[in-house]
């Protein structure tokens, strides 16, 4: 590993990628891959990668991200007027032939270096469209050696420190093999830049360009509305199209509530401006004053009956309100209605609730309060039923008494008859017994056990009920308990000292050598015994002196 670090150049930039599965400390080679590193750092500074996911995972190969759409088909570089280009429009195709632009006029070129290879896990590379010079905002991390990517994708960074284990955990997630999409994708929360070698880099924000034509049209519309105020009056002959709407706003909503019958009237009032606009568009050469007069002429025959309908409406509404002075349904907001629907849905899903009437809660004891709310109560057994414990106990006692009475009435055990037949001393008696025995047709053997019906024998043996009166008896196990047996076992054990055995073998060899030289073995033994007796006598004399 140290050799790999010695071969790779020194990194000149550093960032920390904060994800939902931990941090990733990344070092960038901005000197060897300036275009790729500038693109990555600028997008990270602008917040382009915030809240994006790693949309592709190939276990043992790569973990890919950097697409704001999360599909793998999006993403753009800073060199082609992307999302954070400000007021600038995307570059025309005839102007995308600079040093940073690729041959197709989009993205930017690849940057390969002889000292940057995909030879281990934790390396950062730039994803492309499987074609040269098509790099964008997408990037990937290697999960293992990927030699096939050398010369195809730009390597511009590596993971430093123990954060590579966070990457290994991300690579062990569940994935859909068909789409290579993680089941639970990891999200990039933000990217923190620690070291930025590009001093001229500044954070950019996306600014939406405002079209001046739209503002002029809105101003013209406002001016037309202001000009219509001079026609506001409570007369029956003349009035603006918006007069009924303004008149309704003057009513106090706490006293007069909108009735559902006025909905079609409002639709007709709102549809009038659309009709007037169509007429104005068809008559472009007519002056504004003439258009207003025409509109007034068209609306005058329709307005009087509408106003007559609206005037008697308030007393009718008051009568309705007298019957129900406190309407609660219209005052409820959308949030309150949603909460009520959720509460009703939860109530319908419960098994214990059978009616909508409120049930008074009983005070729970200390033991019942410890039972969780999600627990289900078991069914109580009916007393006296056949499946109760009392009935089972009584049945078991009856069976036990019946078995005990059967043991008492059992016959005594039969004594085992000797299997071998006693033969007489005379051969004639033995021969007579053999003649009386039946010979088998297959082996010609008297009382052949192989040819007898074994099933009948087992049946006869099974019919014997003497086992009920049989008593179990075993021989006393005295091994290890009786002191005499223990001492006998100790005496039988033979302990051999290898040093004593070696000494004995040495003496035997010496005796054999002396015997060959002329000295008898018996004389040697006598000399050895004499020396031993002399030592013992000397020791006894010394012990006797001490005793006195």
From Swiss-Prot:
Enzymatic reactions: [protein]-peptidylproline (omega=180) = [protein]-peptidylproline (omega=0)
Example GO BP: RNA splicing
Positions of the PPIase cyclophilin-type domain: 11-193
Sample GO molecular function, one term: peptidyl-prolyl cis-trans isomerase activity
GO CC terms of this entry: catalytic step 2 spliceosome; cytoplasm
The protein's role, per its UniProt record: PPIases accelerate the folding of proteins. It catalyzes the cis-trans isomerization of proline imidic peptide bonds in oligopeptides. Involved in pre-mRNA splicing.
Protein name: Peptidyl-prolyl isomerase CWC27
Primary localization class, coarse: cytoplasm
Chain segments carrying region Disordered: 204-436, 504-548
Taxonomic placement: Eukaryota, Fungi, Dikarya, Ascomycota, Pezizomycotina
């Amino acid at each position: 590993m140290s050799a790999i670090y010695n071969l790779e150049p020194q990194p000149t930039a550093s960032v920390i990628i904060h994800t939902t599965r931990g941090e990733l400390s990344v070092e960038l080679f901005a000197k060897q891959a300036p275009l790729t590193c500038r693109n990555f750092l600028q997008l990270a500074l602008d917040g382009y990668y915030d809240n994006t996911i790693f949309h592709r995972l190939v276990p043992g190969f790569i973990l890919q991200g950097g697409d704001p759409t999360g599909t793998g088909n999006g993403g753009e570089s800073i060199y082609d007027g992307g999302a954070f280009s400000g007021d600038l429009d995307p570059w025309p195709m005839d102007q995308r032939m600079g040093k940073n632009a690729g041959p197709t006029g989009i993205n930017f070129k690849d940057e390969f270096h002889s000292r940057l290879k995909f030879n281990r896990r934790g390396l950062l590379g730039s994803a492309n469209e499987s074609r040269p010079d098509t790099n964008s905002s997408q990037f990937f991390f290697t999960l293992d050696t990927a030699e096939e990517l050398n010369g195809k994708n730009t390597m511009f960074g590596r993971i430093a420190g123990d954060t590579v284990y966070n990457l290994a955990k991300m690579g062990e997630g569940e994935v859909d093999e068909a789409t290579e999409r993680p089941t639970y994708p990891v999200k990039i929360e933000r990217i923190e830049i620690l070291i930025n070698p590009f001093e001229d880099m500044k954070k950019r924000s996306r600014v939406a360009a405002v079209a001046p034509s739209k503002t002029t049209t809105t101003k013209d519309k406002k001016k037309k509305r202001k000009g219509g105020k001079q026609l506001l009056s409570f007369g029956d002959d003349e009035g603006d199209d918006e007069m009924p709407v303004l008149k309704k706003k003057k009513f106090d909503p706490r006293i007069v509530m909108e009735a559902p019958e006025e909905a079609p009237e409002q639709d007709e009032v709102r549809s009038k401006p659309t009709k007037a606009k169509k007429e104005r568009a068809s008559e472009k050469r007519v002056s504004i004053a003439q258009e207003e007069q025409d509109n007034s002429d068209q609306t005058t025959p329709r307005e009087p009956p509408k106003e007559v309908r609206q005037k008697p409406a308030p007393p009718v509404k008051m009568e309705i309100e007298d019957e129900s002075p406190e309407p609660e349904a219209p005052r409820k907001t959308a949030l309150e209605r949603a909460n009520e629907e959720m509460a009703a849905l939860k109530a319908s899903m419960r098994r214990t609730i059978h009616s909508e009437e409120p049930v008074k809660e009983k005070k729970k004891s200390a033991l019942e309060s410890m039972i969780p709310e999600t627990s289900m109560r078991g069914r109580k057994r009916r007393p006296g039923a056949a499946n109760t414990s009392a009935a089972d106990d009584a049945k078991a006692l009856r069976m036990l008494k019946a078995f005990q009475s059967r043991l008492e009435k059992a016959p005594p055990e039969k004594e085992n008859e000797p299997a071998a037949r006693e033969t007489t001393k005379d051969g004639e008696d033995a021969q007579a017994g053999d003649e009386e025995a039946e010979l088998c047709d297959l082996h010609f053997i008297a009382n052949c056990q192989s040819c007898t019906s074994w099933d009948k024998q087992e049946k006869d043996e099974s019919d014997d009920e003497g086992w009920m009166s049989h008593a179990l008896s075993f021989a006393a196990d005295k091994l290890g308990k009786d002191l005499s047996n223990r001492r006998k076992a100790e005496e039988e054990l033979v302990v051999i000292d290898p040093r004593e055995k070696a000494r004995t073998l040495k003496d035997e060899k010496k005796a054999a050598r002396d015997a060959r030289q002329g000295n008898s073995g018996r004389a040697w033994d006598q000399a050895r015994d004499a020396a031993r007796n002399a030592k013992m006598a000397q020791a006894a004399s010394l012990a006797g002196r001490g005793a006195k």
